[in-house]
Amino acid sequence: MNLTPREKDKLLIAMAAEVARKRRARGVKLNHPEAIALISDAVVEGARDGRSVADLMQAGAEVIRAEDCMEGIAQMILEVQVEATFPDGTKLVTVHNPIR
């Protein structure tokens, strides 16, 4: 399988998000990389589904609650930027204060 660096990054995000989902389902609090992966995956998949940038900026902030994360993680992550592929091209999506 020959993947471009961009495709490898997308695959890594998807895998990390899957690990984070399993841990959250077991009641384990998420760490920084897991929280970022879940938010990023939600944005990338939403773009693939054809959702708008504005919609994903809002939806990305609803993926994780502060109580799902280890202490201090919500305050540490002030924004998440994800480059996602939309039907009309690649765009940078910024989710401000993603963990509330």
UniProtKB/Swiss-Prot annotation:
Pathway assignment: Nitrogen metabolism; urea degradation; CO(2) and NH(3) from urea (urease route): step 1/1
Keyword annotations of the record: Cytoplasm, Hydrolase
Disulfide bond residue pairs: none
EC number(s) stated in the UniProt entry for this protein: 3.5.1.5
Signal sequence range: none
Keyword Hydrolase: yes
Presence of the UniProt keyword Iron-sulfur in the record: no
Group of enzyme by EC: hydrolase
UniProt protein name: Urease subunit gamma
Organism for this UniProt entry: Ruegeria pomeroyi (strain ATCC 700808 / DSM 15171 / DSS-3)
Taxonomy of the source species: Bacteria, Pseudomonadati, Pseudomonadota, Alphaproteobacteria, Rhodobacterales
Gene, per the UniProt record: ureA
